[in-house]
């Protein structure tokens, strides 16, 4: 049985309701439907010109949706979480190709064919055009979905992702030398995967990232100082 959500944090609960309504309203307005699209969502971003992107579950939306379902027992969040988890499982994560690609979630991708100001709007199925990188990939939501459903295909994807992360980390391709988000997101993902499918290889991968962060973290400011002049918004 679920413990009903109380009213102690009313401001938070109000924001949750607004978020749910906003997700559905945007889905309807932008027609975020279709065999390859449903479950994903869109956002705008850019330096100067702003483009519309398929997020490919940027920042692990289904992880948040499923946690909200668990804390509230509200089935609406289960529906959203399952929809996005299945999209991540079937579309975002490649299941064939070289080790550098197979199991590596594809990050967000822009299309100039749909923008809010365009009079004629349509989508193209471009979820798989971009590449994969540890700075734009997440694993906790897929682990959540596997644990909550026992779905064998989700479990297979979790194992594929574990192999991909280990391959990237063993080849020093986890974002070392760049912004904190590469090593940071990779360590979060590897930690979740190590809890789901524990292995010495995953533990070594996590230790590799942790060692790099400790070695390069600024002892006073607590950040990793790297030049990112090509990205002025940072």
What is the predicted role of each segment?
Residues 1-234:
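Catalytic cores of extracellular degradative/oxidative enzymes
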């Amino acid at each position: 049985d679920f413990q009903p959500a109380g009213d102690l944090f009313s401001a938070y609960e109000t924001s949750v309701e607004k978020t749910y309504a906003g997700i559905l309203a945007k889905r309807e307005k932008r027609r975020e439907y279709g065999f390859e699209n449903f479950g994903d969502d869109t956002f705008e971003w850019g330096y100067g010109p702003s483009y519309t992107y398929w997020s490919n579950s940027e920042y692990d939306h289904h992880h948040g949706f499923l946690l909200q379902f668990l804390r509230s027992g509200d089935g609406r969040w289960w529906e959203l979480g399952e929809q996005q988890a299945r999209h991540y499982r079937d579309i975002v994560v490649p299941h064939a190709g070289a080790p550098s690609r197979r199991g590596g979630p594809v990050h967000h991708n822009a299309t100039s064919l749909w923008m809010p100001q365009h009079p004629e709007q349509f989508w193209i199925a471009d979820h798989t055009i971009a590449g994969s990188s540890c700075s734009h990939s997440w694993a906790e939501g897929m682990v959540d979905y596997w644990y909550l459903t026992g779905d064998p295909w989700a479990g297979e994807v979790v194992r594929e992702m574990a192999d991909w992360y280990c391959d990237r980390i063993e080849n020093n391709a986890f974002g070392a030398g760049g912004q904190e988000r590469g090593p940071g997101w990779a360590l979060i993902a590897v930690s979740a995967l190590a809890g789901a499918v524990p292995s010495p290889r995953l533990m070594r991968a996590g230790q590799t990232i942790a060692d790099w962060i400790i070695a390069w973290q600024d002892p006073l400011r607590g950040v990793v100082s790297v030049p990112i002049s090509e990205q002025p918004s940072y």
